[in-house]
Amino acid sequence: MIAEIGRGNFGRALLRLLNTHLADWETESLDKAPDSSRIPNIDILRRARVVIPAVPIASFGEVLRQIAPYLQPGTIVIDVCTIKAHTARQMHSLLPEHVELIACHPLFGPESLAAAGWQLKGLNLVIWAERIQAERYDRIREGLRDLGLNVIELSPQDHDRILARSQFLSLLIGAVLVRMDIQSTEMNTRSFDELLDVRDTTCHDYGILRDVFRFNSACDATLAELEKTLGDIGAELRKSRLPGPG
């Protein structure tokens, strides 16, 4: 059985994917971590072979603390948060050693899944064996490839370094476009339409942007470089402007 924790936008999308593409597995969705008054949730966690906490990065550690006592030996916990090094450290420090760990980042969300008709072919997914038997990890990795996913193996540290100069940058630029209230015009070029696509695909992700910056220290350098570069380009443009008449 697969136990998915979290019913936010991505949690609901993940549950739909599991029910669609892994229909032969029993799947249960938990709205929150268990407590003593929610015995069914505890029973689900004890029976689960795979547990996927699809929760915000800021609450990931607390969810791990709450589920840790109920995870059985050999249970696989798969982290699907946007940031990997921080959550990998939390899994190692908060979960018992008899639990196996996989770090995973699906590089897609509900909007892109809906646009793809909820099919996985060609979508990117980062994965890393944090603490798991090699044969079990290999079966999972190849199973994901069989679903059509483009599986990328990256350590959490490499993942976060690359993300700081890719996804973080697109989220940051999208937030700038939203704050500037950039809108479509009757004079759109193709490149401007693509810029609006960045705005539209990231306009609901400010919370993710904030968490990515908060929990990925590599983003500091990217933000500082962007600020400096914009300042340098602005200064160059103003310097190049021809003086007005007189």
PLM regions: where:
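Interdomain hinge/lid region at the active-site interface
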Residues: 184-246
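Internal alpha-helical scaffold of NAD(P)-dependent oxidoreductase catalytic cores
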Residues: 120-202
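Rossmann-like NAD(P)-binding element
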Residues: 42-71, 76
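Rossmann-like NAD(P)(H) cofactor-binding subdomain of soluble oxidoreductases
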Residues: 65-114
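Active-site capping/gating segments
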Residues: 30, 102-136
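Short glycine-/small-residue-rich Rossmann-like dinucleotide-binding loops
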Residues: 55-57, 81-82, 130
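NAD(P)+-binding Rossmann beta1-loop-alpha1 motif at the extreme N-terminus of oxidoreductases
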Residues: 1-43
